[in-house]
Amino acid sequence: SNLNPENMFNFIVSAFQRHTLRKLPSLNKKKYHSLEDARSVAIVFNSQESEIAEAIGILDKELKKFGISYKGLGISFTKDETTNSKLDHYPYIVQILKKETNWLSIPTIEQAENFYKGEYDILFDLSLQPSFAIEYSIKRCKCGMIVGYCPEREEMYDLCIKGGEGKTEARPSLAEYVKQSIQYLTIIKSK
């Protein structure tokens, strides 16, 4: 039957995770910011996403152009507990390993807490898959607006960049998503 100990444990963990997310207050102010007047940005991502280094490179360049400070929090859930070496040179990005989370996948290291304590005008969710640790991290941040791409988290976003809706249309690359959102955030006026 499906009730082996591992399935049972995963079921219990999943129930606790849902409960934890429900208990977290929403710190998102739903206040639109253009890149012109944003002062601080948060980036939450999965370190192992295939094009993440390119996407962060684009974002890094654009944010610097606008004089916006940013912090990034990457979750790296690999079996071998390694970070994405292509991101190691960014001073404002922390990558968290599985062993640096508790049994619920909540990051427990001080750098994560420092990230959560920040106040951000815009938060970019660059992850493309559902993930408790990512969702938890987004909910812990005080931010004006959330920009994202993950269809499963669409209700959390103030700006959801979509693509690849039709069966024939391929989903845009992560780099394309980032370019589209930067373009949009450059055009909009802050409210």
Where are these regions (language model features)?
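Short, charged/polar "capping" segments at the starts of alpha-helices
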Residues: 50-52, 79-85, 155-156
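Structural motif
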Residues: 44-48, 75-77, 126-128
